[in-house]
Design a protein with these regions (language model features):
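Short glycine/proline- and charge-enriched loop/turn segments
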Residues: 61-69, 136-142, 200, 205
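A short, flexible beta-alpha/helix-coil linker loop
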Residues: 14-19, 52, 196-200
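A short, N-terminal amphipathic alpha-helix
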Residues: 29-44, 78-89
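CN hydrolase (nitrilase-like) catalytic-core segments centered on the catalytic cysteine
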Residues: 72-93, 164, 170-216
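Generic N-terminal amphipathic, Lys/Arg-enriched alpha-helix
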Residues: 4-20
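Active-site beta-strand/loop signature of hydrolases that rely on acidic residues for catalysis
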Residues: 9, 36-64, 94-95, 172, ...
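Beta-strand-turn-beta hairpins that frame and shape the catalytic cleft
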Residues: 1-9, 157-166, 189
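Catalytic-core segment of enzymes that process non-peptidic bonds
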Residues: 69-167
Length: 216
């Protein structure tokens, strides 16, 4: 494949998404950011982790019907038709994250879509942080391990007109094997969408790890 050797990449920062915000309103915000990126001649645009909804792992949800609303059974191509029309016209590639339900198995997923308006790559988050059960001492939760299964696609790379792309999601960035596996496959550009709270309450059981980090 003929690569574009130099191009502009953009990080599309959505900001907070309210639990009451519908997916259509979020996609409208994504479109506005994409227009801004286009004005700066960006060819690769990276949206955050789980960017179609609020970051629902913060909440303890016991009603399965309410939880199901956050998931997609496939990449929401019809919901994002205006976005895909623009990237098709401008020959762009975007990545974005969403909660995927694959035949009953939930994943924290990120995908690439190019100017063909088709998925050209998919990754499922491997290093899930947080906890599985409700912890009442926390003002908010971090329940990724409850709501998602560990990714089962490895760290693939994708041959595109912008080079060999690879991706990871949020906590994956903290583990050296993420970069090693991608690099050994010839990855040239890695994209990382993440969704990190401003404050995460202390976990006393991790104090010894914090002390270790402080002495590195």
């Amino acid at each position: 494949m003929n690569y574009k050797s130099k191009y502009t990449a953009a990080a599309a920062q959505l900001g907070p998404i309210n639990p009451k915000d519908c997916k259509e309103s979020v996609v409208s915000r994504m479109f506005d950011l994409l227009v801004e990126a286009k004005a700066q001649e960006a060819k690769l645009v990276v949206f955050p982790e789980l960017c179609l909804t609020t970051f629902f792992p913060r909440y303890y949800i016991t009603d399965q019907a309410k939880l199901d609303v956050f998931y997609e059974t496939e990449a929401p191509l019809s919901l994002m038709s205006d976005i895909f029309e623009l990237i098709s016209k401008e020959n762009m590639i975007i990545s974005f994250g969403f909660a995927e339900n694959d035949n009953g198995t939930p994943f924290n997923t990120s995908v690439y879509v190019d100017s063909s308006r088709k998925l050209i790559g998919k990754y499922r988050k491997i290093h899930l942080p947080g906890h599985t059960e409700y912890e009442p001492h926390r003002p908010f939760q971090h329940l990724e391990k409850r709501y998602f299964k560990k990714g089962n696609l490895g760290f693939p790379i994708f041959d595109t007109n912008l080079g060999k792309l690879g991706m990871c999601i949020c906590n994956d960035r903290r583990w050296p094997e993420t970069y090693r596996v991608l690099a050994l496959q010839g990855c040239e550009v890695m994209t990382l969408g993440y969704n990190t709270p401003k404050h995460y309450p202390l976990a006393p059981e991790h104090d010894h790890l914090q002390e270790f980090h402080n002495h590195l």
